Amino acid sequence: MKQRTLSIIKPDALKKKVVGKIIDRFESNGLEVIAMKRLHLSVKDAENFYAIHRERPFFKDLIEFMVSGPVVVMVLEGKDAVAKNRDLMGATDPKLAQKGTIRADFAESIDANAVHGSDSLENARNEIAFFFAARDL
C-alpha cells in the first residue's frame, strides 16, 4: 500500500554533509521525496514535536540536540513507506543497527543518530501535518 511518512535528517548528519547520501538511500529503495525543507527548529517547536517524550529522562538532551543546528524535514512516499523507512534507518542505537542502514553508516550515538522517522501511519500523518500544509504535498 502506498503510504507517506515523515523523515528528519538531524543536525549531526548535516554537519557531516551526508544529506545527499541519506536521500539517495531513500530514493534508491523506492521512497520518493514529495516535500522537503531545511530549517532550524526553535526550542518550542522541538518540544511540541517531541511532546510524547516530555516525561522521559532524555527529553532535555533530545531538545538541545535537535535545536543545535539545522535539520532537513521530508515527506517520503512509497509502498509501505513507514516500515521501509524504519528498516532503512536501522536501530535507534547505531551500535545495534545492522550494517548498511543509515544509522550504522552515518550516526555516532543513540542521541546523535542521524535521522528520525515516523513509527506508525497515524504518527506519520500527525508529524507530516506538524511541518507541512496540505498544499505543500
Swiss-Prot record:
The organism's place on the tree of life at top rank = Bacteria
* UniProt-listed InterPro entries: NDK-like_dom (IPR034907), NDK-like_dom_sf (IPR036850), Nucleoside_diP_kinase (IPR001564), Nucleoside_diP_kinase_AS (IPR023005)
One GO CC term of this entry? cytoplasm
Q: What is its main location?
A: cytoplasm
**This enzyme's EC code(s):** 2.7.4.6
Q: Does the keyword GTP-binding apply?
A: no
- Is the keyword Kinase in the record? yes
Give GO MF terms, alphabetically.
Answer: ATP binding; metal ion binding; nucleoside diphosphate kinase activity
Which reaction(s) are listed as its catalytic activity? a 2'-deoxyribonucleoside 5'-diphosphate + ATP = a 2'-deoxyribonucleoside 5'-triphosphate + ADP; a ribonucleoside 5'-diphosphate + ATP = a ribonucleoside 5'-triphosphate + ADP
Q: What biological process terms from GO does the record include?
A: CTP biosynthetic process; GTP biosynthetic process; UTP biosynthetic process
Name the residues that bind ATP: K10, F58, R86, T92, R103, N113
State where the protein is found: Cytoplasm
Keyword terms: ATP-binding, Cytoplasm, Kinase, Magnesium, Metal-binding, Nucleotide metabolism, Nucleotide-binding, Phosphoprotein, Transferase
The coenzyme or cofactor needed here is: Mg(2+)
Active-site residues annotated for this sequence: H116
**How is the quaternary structure described?**
Homotetramer.
Report the sequence similarity comment from the record: Belongs to the NDK family.
Q: Which NCBIfam families match?
A: PRK00668.1
What this chain does, per the record?
Major role in the synthesis of nucleoside triphosphates other than ATP. The ATP gamma phosphate is transferred to the NDP beta phosphate via a ping-pong mechanism, using a phosphorylated active-site intermediate.
> What is the protein name stated in its UniProt record?
Nucleoside diphosphate kinase
Q: Which organism is it from?
A: Helicobacter pylori (strain Shi470)
Q: What is the lineage of its organism?
A: Bacteria, Pseudomonadati, Campylobacterota, Epsilonproteobacteria, Campylobacterales
